[in-house]
Amino acid sequence: MQYKYIFPLLCFVLSAPLSAQQVADNDNRTLSADSIITTDSRLDSLFQTLPEVMVTGERPIVKAQPGKLVYDLPRLISNQPVDNAYDAMKELPGVTEMNGGLQLAGQSVTVILDGKVTTLSTEQLYALLKSIPASRIEKAEVMYNAPARYQVRGALINITLKQATEGSNSWQGELYGKYKQKHNEGFEERASLLFNKNKFSADFLYSHIHGRGYSVTDKEAMHSLSDGSVHLLTTNEVGHSRSHTHSFRVGTDYNIAENHQLSFVYNGNYSTYHNRMNIKGSQVSEVKSNSTDWMHNGRLDYRTPFGLKAGAELTYYNSPSNQLLHSRLQDEQLDFLTEDCQRINRWKFFLAQEHTLKSGWGLNYGAVYTTSIDNSFQYYFDPETGEPLTSSDAINNMKSRRQEQTLNIYAGFSKSLGDKLSMDASLAVEHYKTSVWNQWDWYPTINLTYMPAPGHVLQMALSSDKDYPDYWAVQDNISYIGGGYSEIHGNPLLKPAQDYQFKMTYILKSKYIFSAWFDHTRDYAVQTLYQSSNRLVEIYKYLNFDYQQQAGLQASVPFTIKKWLNSRITLMGIWHHEKDNDFWDIPFNRKRVYGIAQMNNTFTLSTKPDLKLNVTGFVHSKAIQGIYDLPTSGNVNAALRYSLAKGKAIVNLYCNDIFETGQISPYIRFKTQNVTNHYSCFREVGVSFTYKFGGYKEKEREAVDTSRFK
């Protein structure tokens, strides 16, 4: 980000309260390079309800229950230009969007729907959330430390969706359309329907996102080789892309009797992507790539009145792609056609039991078994003759079949100790087996909730977790990006990372939230860049660090000015430490303190007609990732929201990243490593229209994990 933009950005932030509602779309970038076909692959990188305290003239937006905070999310977003579940979650205190994903208090967070954990990857789950209308949300439960009975470890957000109530027939629906311009045009159409008849209810959802993309990347590198030579490389990369994504969901519930239910949910996704890239400068390259992704996910759940829950889930994912590459770099020449595919079959079965006992005791236990088979290949061909090419230093043909099995057995209890103190504790034992790893681990979880006075809540949590690597990251393969100078290397020896965290949260007057935490991650894994000392290539590869540590403080403070301004400010300060003693030939031990500021303001311009202006913003100071340095970044967004037809129709005009300061240009200046990537940044303007029809007679409904797919 150019420094001349920092001052006006900060002035705007301080003069008009802001927030971090960053718009997520196909142009979001993260510091990884997992796919050879993205627009810019280098940047992929108990049970006791506590009393509420009413603030004069306001309803509480949050109430505390043992181990979790329950937010009135529809109220939080009622005046915001939010039209889908993903953007709605970004309005929760402490939730930010970083690198195209959601974080809670600076840490990764798992999102589930209706209390059901899915086998969808993170990317597939986010796509599903973006297709779910915000009007379908009933509430959000935030857990900084999820008990084992949720079959999730670490931070968790549970989104409960509205359903029709039992009784007479009812139906309702929503139509949505959006047009945006971010250098090139983009479109979205969405339709949803909710139906109920006696004991049966169903929901249907379809969305279509499509458009064109444009990106520019300027690279500057000083590449040092072991022979003492230094090579100056400067390139200009221009990419043009187009894509279509179709998402569909069908969910059904049959209520056999009270608390006796059979449910089935199907989620599907089909997408196509086409990219053309031209590179000039020290390297001259032309790259064309295409991909098609199919995902099918089905889940069956059965719940009984005596606390028994059972279920099964199947996920099928298939992602074939191809790439045609012609590249010249000094005396090196690359000419080949690559065809690759990842096909995943994953099954999950679970059985869980909960008991409500006397004297405030609760008992829960269960087992979860997950198995997957990854069939992947990557082959190289001569682009002229179509003949297969044999493996060499530059070409690595690969075909693999990898099976993974996980068995998790857990038990836990809850106890109310009077009116002010409650406790929830559990222990999970897990066996993880692959062709490389065969290990047992245990994961303790403890939550304490103390209410010294009405409206004042103190929560303390101790948790442990494991983060599994992506399937494609552990393949023994080499892929090319950036015209050939950049290579992506798989790492078959990549191991899961293990995380341990202690966190304290204090809620004042049921709306002011303060948190402090410490987190230690052993074998932390992230994709990093390394300029090879043996040849003129830069290598992107997932590696296990010795550890990563974080300590942080967070404050979330909402405030209002009469009836015309509703605001919230969230501040975070984080100490960040990463260490790796065997990082190639340049071990590192790096520390950094950085801050994050989010602010959100809604100005009521008029009540008749209903017209509101939303101004949001985000600032993130300098940070690190491995040997990367990440510059200061931030954005300012504005949206004008007009509600008509008694709230059934909403028109939203918006402009995101007004100052074009949201995209960072990461750089490396560490020992022999010297490289900078300047990425293009464009403001986005758009308009959306939402129309609701039918009538809601509300009841209560969850999503899948695809984070590790290619």
Please tell me what each predicted stretch does.
Residues Q22-I77, E97-N99, G106-S108, E141, ...:
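Short, acidic, small-residue-rich periplasmic hinge/interaction motif at the N-terminus
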Residues A85-A88, L125-A127, V152-Y176, F187-E189:
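N-terminal periplasmic accessory domains that precede
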Residues T118-N145:
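Short acidic/polar hinge/loop motifs at secondary-structure boundaries
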Residues G177-H183, K197, H208-R212, G268-T272, ...:
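Transmembrane beta-strands of outer-membrane beta-barrel pores
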Residues N184-R212, G228-N275, H296, T304-P305, ...:
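Transmembrane beta-barrel wall of Gram-negative outer-membrane proteins
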Residues T245-S271, V287-P444, T449-G455, S510-A516, ...:
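Face-selective signature of the C-terminal outer-membrane beta-barrel domain
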Residues K466-A516, H520, Y540-G552, T560, ...:
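Outer-membrane beta-barrel signature, preferentially recognizing the C-terminal barrel domain
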Residues K591-K710:
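Conserved C-terminal beta-signal and adjacent last beta-strands/turns
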